[in-house]
Amino acid sequence: MGRKWANIVAKKTAKDGANSKVYAKFGVEIYVAAKKGDPDPESNSALKFVIDRAKQAQVPKHIIDKAIDKAKGNTDETFTEGRYEGFGPNGSMLIVDTLTSNVNRTAANVRAAFGKNGGNMGASGSVSYLFDNKGVIVFGGEDADAVFEQLLEADVDVDDVEAQEGTITVYTAPTDLHKAIVALRESGIEEFQVTELEMIPQSEVELSGEDLETFEKLYSVLEDDEDVQKIYTNVDGF
């Protein structure tokens, strides 16, 4: 699993580096986090968490600063979080998290993306019960046992720690992700490849041929929607 995360991060970072839509999505997320609390990330842990993720995706500093400055202003623009669940070809499943200023527009767009690209929308809970909500942290290292002990000493609810090919992957209870990050930073870890709340599939499916092509198109259309923040799937490699 550790190598999987590293591979996904490498692929995502390469794509994000040239993708202005990703920058815009992080801009919205940073704005919302700053608007809900203090616009200073040192006193707003939710904002700091989003900024750290943005930096991992190589979002330029001026995009981050612009979103924070917007939150400091008098704008009354509001955004609503949403979650949609659905099915793709041959046992594939997707969970789509959105952040939008127009819920009706977003719902229609997500439904159309599924319907026009070989998928179909499901009811709330039709997919998510087959996924586990976890905090995921990935960083360079070798000694998984030492990291596990360190997190236990910091009273972190840690599910598992894996080491593979120089990369350590930590899985925590979602409520303890921030605590785990703080504990690891205090131990001297300065750079993280991943710090995310994830919906992890309990089992994965492998697609090939036309099924894979159909799924890739569906995933791409959803990913390109400006209101879609994250997509979780049970398809291997995504």
Curated annotation (Swiss-Prot):
GO CC annotations on file: cytosol
Cystine connections: none
Pfam families assigned to the protein according to its UniProt record, in alphabetical order: TACO1_YebC_N (PF20772), Transcrip_reg (PF01709)
Single Gene Ontology BP annotation: regulation of DNA-templated transcription
Organism: Streptococcus pneumoniae serotype 4 (strain ATCC BAA-334 / TIGR4)
Sequence intervals crossing the membrane: none
UniProt keyword Transcription, yes or no: yes
Protein's recorded name: Probable transcriptional regulatory protein SP_1922
GO function term, MF aspect, one: DNA binding
PANTHER family: TRANSLATIONAL ACTIVATOR OF CYTOCHROME C OXIDASE 1
Main location: cytoplasm
